[in-house]
Amino acid sequence: MSQSTTTTTTTTAAPAVPTGPREATLDAGNFCKRVKILYDSWNSDSNLWKSANSLVLALGQPNESNPYQKVTSLQTWLFGYELKDTIIVFLEKEIYIVSTSKKINLFQKLSETEQVKTELSSIKFNFLTIDKSDKNKSNFEKLIGEATKAGSNIGVIIKETYIGDLALQWEAALNECPLTKVDITPALSSCLLVKDLQEQKNIITSAKITSKVLKSHILPKIETIIDKGERQTHNQLADYAADIFESPEKISSKLTVEHVDYSYVPIIQSGGIYDLRASASSDDNPLHFGTIIVSCGARYKNYCSNIARTYIIDPTSDQKKNYAILLNVQSNVIKAIKPDVTFSSLYEKAIQTIKESSKPELVDHFPKNVGYGIGIEFQESLAVLNATNSRTLKAGMTLNIACGFQKISNPEGKDEKSKTYSLLISDTVLLNDEGKVEVLTDVGKKASDVVYMLGGEDDDDDNDNDPSVKLELPDDVKGITGRTIETKEKSKSVEERRRDHQKMLEQKNLQEAENKIKAMTDPNGKKGTPEVDYTAITKLQPIYSSVGAYPQDIVKNKMYIDPKKETVLFPIFGYMVPFHISTIKNISKSEEYIRVNFNTPTSYTQEQIDAGFVPPQLMYIREVTYKVNDPKVLANNIRLIKELKKKFTTRETEDREKRNLITQEKLILLRGKFPRLPEVHARPTLSGARRTIGILEAHENGIRFNPTSTKDRTPIDVLYKNIKHAIYQQADQESMAVIHFHLHDALMIGKKKTKDVQFYIEISEMSQSLDVSSRFNDEEEEERRERALKEKINNDFKTFIKRVEEIAPEPGLEFDVPYRELGFYGVPNVSTVFIQPSVHCLLSILEPPFFVLTLDDVEIACFERAIRSLKNFDLSFVFKDYNRPPIRISVIPRNYFETVKEWLDSFNIKFYQSERNYNWKRIMDTIKSDVKKFHDDGGWSFLDLEEEEEEEDSGDDDYHSNSDESESSDYISSMSSGSDDDDEDSSEGENWEDLEQKAERDDKMKTFDETNKRKRDEKSVSSSNRPSSSKSGSSSSGGGGGGGGSSRSKSSSSSSKGSSSSSSKSSSSKRK
């Protein structure tokens, strides 16, 4: 391609333009693609381009008061940079560029690339260097002469203000020439509407930055101001937010000042004076704790994004209704965004939604548009979403969807500034190349995210019964005040409100249960639960290849233990029969008898089945009893078998844990300075050490703990994506500051598999020596030092956590902080601990064993032993996954009863009350056997103590049993010792020790005083003759019996799919 260049001699290229990097290069690919878009539009739509024969982009010095000049936007779009002192003239087949020698050098390199030569071969490039000697007269004559040859109309940006010598000289020359100037501003804007993939990526990143600033900086700042009752003006808050954009390392360590800026100075509004226009600004009025509107937007590589949220403190019922309607309006507008839909139809959708709502009069308070296009320009003038814009949406467009109500009267406001308020919600969205809409800004906007209730303040307006606008406890309760957060309803007592909410939760659970049943059933109506085919399990290898491979020192008719093969050989009818140790369930003795119980398919756990420990044969020996005259031999055999079983079980447990481990991806280390906490303790400890001390570091995709106090220096890596719950408990009333991670997938730390990893620092000052005389105020001084130390450690932890949340990739990592005021004492494991709820879980993390219960996994909670005369009660949690065993927290002091009920209700957990303890294992087994029947029979309603009481009250004074009651108590019966079948089951396979203990308990029960308070024995096995309040059926599925005889055995024929124990008993036979 030929070039005509009238330029002065060029020295070595100085590659920097003022706003670009030092070694600036122009992207040939983007340039070619976007020049084609410009020429295609110019050639195809002469009306849009006003029949212009040539086009001009002229920039002298940028207008600092207008960061979104049209010419700079076009320069950025074409070349990636703002190019000062540059004039570009586009002709039909030529492009003329006038600029400084340094920039000309860049343009020449661009024009000489193979891509430009190939894709823009029809266009000739001409470069003219600025000539100050004649004030560019010759250059301008050349440009105007070529433009005149092309035609009489020259396209310019009419309203652009020219600044700088070059631009003013060009303006004068253009005014003196005979060419007719036509305005091509709309045509140039049309080129910017549809974004390519690179532009979309920039806007997505910009939206993430915007979301991070609001979520992690502006909102916490506002909450702190409200919490402490500080006085700060809107402008002070706006300046604080602007400083975050100007220091992008506070947002993410990957961001740089060159690429990040704010789209506009953030806007904070409150106190009755609101402006919903994009041109609004903050004022010097103090922040009012009523309705607060926050707007902010980031600019990443010159591409803009925007977000706005309204936060409401102590709203009236009207405010809640209006906000719910506004949410619905924005949701419907976003759903209506599709290719080839007109901009005006989106506005019409918003108006329609308001008119169809319960408050159609809000139309009068709705703005004249629902947003606009956004990209390099913050507001794309051709893409305003109003009632008159007939342009259509195209894939690749990005929009700022802004919906609001302005100047709404609020006569019930708590003060004069609350009498008028406005609402605004705004999000940046993308209509992607697949024609689907994506919301790019990610900050909560549900009522539970934006509504705050200051405790202790009456809300006379909370008598609204509309479930669509029901005020919920915010999901991310930040503790705006140190007081208990509460909502009061004037027309209802607390108990009535709670009861109504519980009924609503019950209906919600029923709906979820229906969905669960549908998911478990295939289209043919068959259950989706797979059956286990025992005949297909062949993982156990043959122990001995033949009888000749038996050990040489074996003695006929004597039991033999072979540790090498992990096998016990039993004499049966004169033959030595080998049994792998995994087939032996337990072994016991009584006087001169030794009794062995075997595992059979009905007594194997699912893990054992999955591990392949179920033999494929269909005939199984369930028990065998031998008479051994020598007590020493008997004791030695039992000892050897138990030791072998323990060794095997330990090894298999470790192997199974290792098999189940998920392989983690590698930790990506950050270079340079990264967040770290020194002298931190870790739990679990490494290699059995008493303490493990080291350095906690935050990196790109996870946390690393580098131990410094142990011989084992293997680091502990926790990836962000593997963290289910991140918990921070500060050293307030506790003696340690703790960062605790509850994981999705377990880690192997040392030889221990764990889902809970903890890092902490103990607050331990040097104790005062008792043999040294103390000063009068030593104790006070020590308390002061401890408080100062706690404050320092808390600040260090908070700084580290804040940096971790900034580094963690989207959707980000947020730390839960427990609510101490909602805590209570209980026994979740083996000892009494203080248990606290947080936003997402119930936890006790100060001492191992740790307890972390995910509240989202809970279906119901059940209060057990909820009797006023008792000093404590129990609380059980049943999970949505019925395969998970329920968890019980025992011995909770009675004075916490109302507190626990209140927070369970606030966290939307349905609870029941009962005067007894349930055998949850039996209940869950019954439910899992037929989930559909369980829910058809009323589901969890059998746990409802209040309903039971109502039924009892409605009947006669005397108790009358009936068939209906027996049917309704199908599941309640599970708390007793079990059905007759279960009793028969438990009479087989019990060892002698169990039988003796059972007999002793039966004797004691005869003298049991019915007037005494019921005592709970956690280790007791339920009796078959009385209801039990503790776990029943602790003995194995084999049970009872056993007699004398030198060699007796019971066997059962079990189907390949696992017959019930009753069928096993009926088909007893001897193994041949």
From Swiss-Prot:
Which residues does the annotated region (Disordered) include?
1-21, 946-1072
Example of a GO cellular component annotation carried by this entry? FACT complex
Which residue windows does the record flag with biased composition (Basic and acidic residues)? 995-1020
Taking the first listed entry, what is the main subcellular location of this protein, grouped into a coarse class? nucleus
Database matches in Pfam families: FACT-Spt16_Nlob, Peptidase_M24, PH_SPT16, Rttp106-like_middle, SPT16
Q: Report the protein's function.
A: Component of the FACT complex, a general chromatin factor that acts to reorganize nucleosomes. The FACT complex is involved in multiple processes that require DNA as a template such as mRNA elongation, DNA replication and DNA repair. During transcription elongation the FACT complex acts as a histone chaperone that both destabilizes and restores nucleosomal structure.
Q: Which CDD domains match?
A: CDC68-like
Subunit (UniProt): Forms a stable heterodimer with ssrp1. The spt16-ssrp1 dimer associates with a HMG box DNA-binding domain protein, probably nhp6, to form the FACT complex.
- Keywords of the record: Chromosome, Coiled coil, DNA damage, DNA repair, DNA replication, Nucleus, Transcription, Transcription regulation
Phylogenetic lineage: Eukaryota, Amoebozoa, Evosea, Eumycetozoa, Dictyostelia
* Name of the featured protein: FACT complex subunit SPT16
Coiled-coil stretches: 486-522
Organism of derivation: Dictyostelium discoideum (Social amoeba)
